[in-house]
Amino acid sequence: MSESRSGTSAPTVLRMILGRRLQDMRLAADASLEDAAKALRVTPLTIRRLEKAEVALKPLYVEKLLETFGADRQEIDEFVDLAEQANEPGWWHSYRDAVPSWFTAYVSLETGAQTLRTYEPQYVTGLLQTHDYARAVLRGGLPNGSEEELARRVELRLRRQSLLEREDAPTLWVVMEEAVLHRTVDSPEVMREQIERLLDVSELPHVSLDVVSFDAGAHAGACAPFTYFRFAEPELPDIVYSEILSASVYLDQRVDVVAHLEAHSRMALLTSSEDSRALLNRMRKEYS
């Protein structure tokens, strides 16, 4: 997979749902990729890309495909309405001037997820960062960027955090390394404020925060940071996003997703919420 709300309205997520449903309709009608391509006068590869949500689905395409598959008028109208919603830009599209296109897909998945799990070996996860911490981290990754671009990226990062305040907020389970707390980002004052933020959010009923201490030794998480997404919609697969210095990847093959889930669970077993809060409180005092 190359790209990739607990309600359904994030455009990329809607496109994925629509693609999966169209594929199911095609298979139920015993129609081949070639049959569908002929109806739209496109190539079979284009149909495959439509079903995989790699390109936008025009409402007219949806209508013609469903007519080919023998759908009734009510089904056609419902699918066309879904296609129109999927083509509406999300709020994050207004930040396309400040972030790469692949990241807008990430925000769509994050906004649409019912469950989020993250592993962070170096920095506090973006959803829990304070303004000053986020600014320092983003500045480090944008050495030649303008102040305006930096400000836009910080604004986007903080706006993403509003999903934790929604009535239908997703559950968030963060596993992070103790090293994150020892890496002084910007200043002791910034770190103290950041740790206080972590202590506050760890009390939210839908947020779990586990800090793996140095005492845990070598463990399954000695790897790159990753985020796991699970959606309420049964059509959607679980997805893992992982990144390295110069690249990022979205994984939806079951074997890859399970490997990351198991690693996350094993790391969480190395600590507890109580131990994590105690460690956070100790580190807060060290930065005082």
Give the location of each predicted region.
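Short amphipathic helix-turn modules centered on a small-residue break
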Residues: 48-50
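Key DNA-contact positions within bacterial/archaeal DNA-binding proteins
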Residues: 34, 44-45
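Interdomain hinge/linker segments and adjacent boundary elements that couple functional modules
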Residues: 2-20, 24, 28, 33-38, ...
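C-terminal regulatory/effector modules of DNA-binding transcriptional regulators
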Residues: 175, 185-288
